[in-house]
């Protein structure tokens, strides 16, 4: 199965990175047998070429004029594409020629939830970073420079300028790299753990998010909005799978909430256990709960960007998965999450 970002990002039009010089064939003039020659050798004479071709159109027959107008439009499109490609290649080439010596560079895209997932982790850890938003329409993700740091030509990818410009790709791998590095350098990391058992629990949810949660939402979005022709069965299949995934998370959070209420609301614990008083009446019913332990970890935060777009496939978290909704709402209120989602 393709990676999640591919299903969202490949629906954008990729243009080729390199343009070859083009030659337009001569068109004979019926009256004076003159020809309009188009020979594009380099960017500097392209403007004159278009002017000559436009002038020549005035003296040819209607049929030839129509053909030359088509040729002119194609040439203009090619020149525009060539100029855009040169500009984008220059942008990414300049970055790699003058890389920072400190901090991190995150390669992302404005519509890539996995890129924002990494941005959230960087922001939560208060690590200095800059985001380089790639332009997929101009093929920046396929440039030799970028493929060097991510052979899969997808986002996200991260460069650690503190560590000899080490590059890491895939959002899960980047997340583990960041929290492990932070733990090693600072002795503790609130988003991770010193405890091996907790580390395994956090990793389980992190891998569940990267292998089940994100890909299913990505596929549902793809078949709902971007596929070349309607496939209702695919939309239904992936949307149902997203609901199944959220059912797993909802159950885990509900169990965490019940344990929290029974622990903190001691005077009413017996009534809750007997079922005479519903848990929803507890003053702790809206208290934050987390997937692992009593604090926010990367296990929780990795879900945020995708939870933020799931309404686009017709899933209402507040109605269908209330615990997931409250959990997401608490995380969305965190300053670091707000900064990351804004693209700061």
Swiss-Prot record:
GO biological processes: negative regulation of transcription by transcription factor localization; nitrate assimilation; protein localization; protein urmylation; regulation of nitrogen utilization
Gene source species: Candida albicans (strain SC5314 / ATCC MYA-2876) (Yeast)
Gene Ontology CC: cytoplasm
CDD domains cross-referenced by the UniProt entry: GST_C_Ure2p, GST_N_Ure2p_like
SUPFAM superfamilies: GST C-terminal domain-like, Thioredoxin-like
Protein keywords: Nitrate assimilation
InterPro entries, A to Z: Glutathione-S-Trfase_C-like, Glutathione-S-Trfase_C_sf, Glutathione_S-Trfase, Glutathione_S-Trfase_N, GST_C, Thioredoxin-like_sf, Ure2
Assembly description: Homodimer.
Family: Belongs to the GST superfamily.
Function: Plays an important role in the cellular response to the nitrogen source. URE2 gene plays a major part in the repression of GLN1 and GDH2 genes by glutamine, and is required for the inactivation of glutamine synthetase. URE2 gene product may catalytically inactivate GLN3 in response to an increase in the intracellular concentration of glutamine.
Pfam families assigned to the protein according to its UniProt record, in alphabetical order: GST_C, GST_N
Region spans: Disordered: 1-49
Gene3D superfamilies: 1.20.1050.10, Glutaredoxin (3.40.30.10)
Lineage top rank: taxon: Eukaryota
Domain GST N-terminal: from-to ranges: 102-186
Biased composition (Low complexity): 9-49
Domain GST C-terminal, residue spans: 195-344
Protein name (Swiss-Prot/TrEMBL): Protein URE2
One Gene Ontology MF term: glutathione transferase activity
């Amino acid at each position: 199965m393709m990676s999640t970002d591919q299903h969202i990002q490949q629906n954008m039009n990729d243009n080729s990175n390199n343009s070859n010089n083009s030659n337009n064939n001569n068109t004979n003039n019926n009256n004076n047998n003159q020809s309009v020659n188009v020979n594009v050798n380099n960017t500097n004479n392209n403007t004159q070429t278009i002017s000559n071709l436009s002038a020549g159109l005035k003296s040819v027959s209607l049929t030839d004029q129509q053909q030359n107008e088509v040729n002119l439009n194609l040439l203009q499109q090619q020149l525009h594409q060539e100029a855009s490609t040169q500009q984008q290649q220059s942008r990414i080439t300049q970055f790699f020629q003058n890389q920072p010596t400190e901090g991190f560079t995150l390669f992302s895209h404005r519509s890539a939830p996995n890129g924002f997932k990494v941005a959230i982790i960087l922001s939560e850890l208060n690590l200095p970073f800059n985001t380089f938003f790639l332009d997929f329409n101009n093929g920046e993700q396929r440039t030799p420079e970028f493929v060097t740091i991510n052979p899969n030509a997808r986002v996200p990818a991260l460069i650690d300028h503190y560590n000899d410009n080490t590059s890491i790709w895939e959002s899960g791998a980047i997340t583990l790299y960041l929290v492990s590095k932070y733990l090693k350098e600072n002795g503790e990391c609130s988003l991770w753990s010193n405890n091996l058992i907790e580390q395994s629990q956090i990793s389980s949810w992190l891998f569940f998010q990267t292998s089940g949660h994100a890909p299913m939402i990505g596929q549902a979005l793809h078949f709902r909005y971007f596929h070349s022709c309607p496939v209702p069965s695919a939309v239904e299949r992936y949307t149902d799978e997203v609901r199944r995934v959220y059912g797993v998370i909802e159950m885990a959070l509900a169990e965490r909430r019940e344990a929290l209420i029974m622990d903190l609301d001691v005077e009413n614990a017996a009534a809750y256990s007997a079922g005479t008083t519903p848990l929803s009446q507890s003053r702790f019913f809206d208290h934050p709960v987390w997937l692992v332990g009593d604090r926010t970890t990367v296990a929780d935060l990795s879900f945020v960007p995708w939870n933020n777009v799931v309404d686009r496939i017709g899933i209402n978290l507040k109605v269908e998965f209330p615990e997931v909704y409250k959990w997401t709402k608490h995380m969305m209120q965190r300053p670091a999450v707000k900064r990351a989602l804004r693209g700061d």
